[in-house]
Structures are given as structure tokens and as C-alpha cells.
Amino acid sequence: MDVVVGAHVPQFICETFYEDGKVRLKPIKGQCVPETFRISSSRAFRESFPVGSHFICRDGFFMLKGSDETVFIKASDVIIYKIIRK
């Protein structure tokens, strides 16, 4: 997939996981975005569910680039809407 900053990201499935001692969100393998991407959301949301929980993420995501050139997906907690596992 070509990374285009500012591009709309369609619906995909993501999961919570541990990285550097923190709970993070990432797309699962085989989705429309690489699993190496991280999804920016509130810490309260990420920590509300067991690690390994899967979610269906609806339309409304956009690719952004941080000051350190990291590409990530910005998400509102209301867009991450359905737990499908755990």
C-alpha cells in the first residue's frame, strides 16, 4: 500500500497489544493498512479492554505524519466501535 499523508483510510480491524510497556492499537495482518502502523487513540480507551482485543474501525481515519516522520493513523474513540474478540 502506498502511504499518502492525509489520505482517508477505509474500515479495517485492529487489536490492542503491548509495546514499550504501554497498550497500543495496530491493524491486524492482511488489512488495507500495514500492521506496522500504529493507531492514535486515547489511553483510557486502549486500557479499557484486555490486550489482544479486536475492534472493527469505521470510516473516519486519516494518515498523518508525526514530527519524527512516523506515519500513523489518527482515530477518534467513537470511530473504534465494535469489539469482535475478547
Give residue ranges: language-model regions:
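Short, surface-exposed loop motifs enriched in S/T, G, D/E and P with embedded aromatic residues
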Residues: 14, 39, 57-59
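Beta-strand/loop nucleic-acid-binding surfaces
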Residues: 32-48
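Short peripheral tails and domain-boundary helices/loops at the edges of structured domains
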Residues: 70-86
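Flexible glycine-rich surface loops and low-complexity tracts that mediate binding to linear polymers
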Residues: 52-67
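Short, basic/aromatic beta-hairpin or loop at an interaction surface
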Residues: 21-36
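Short glycine-rich, polar/acidic loop-and-turn segments at beta strand-coil junctions
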Residues: 29, 43, 59-63
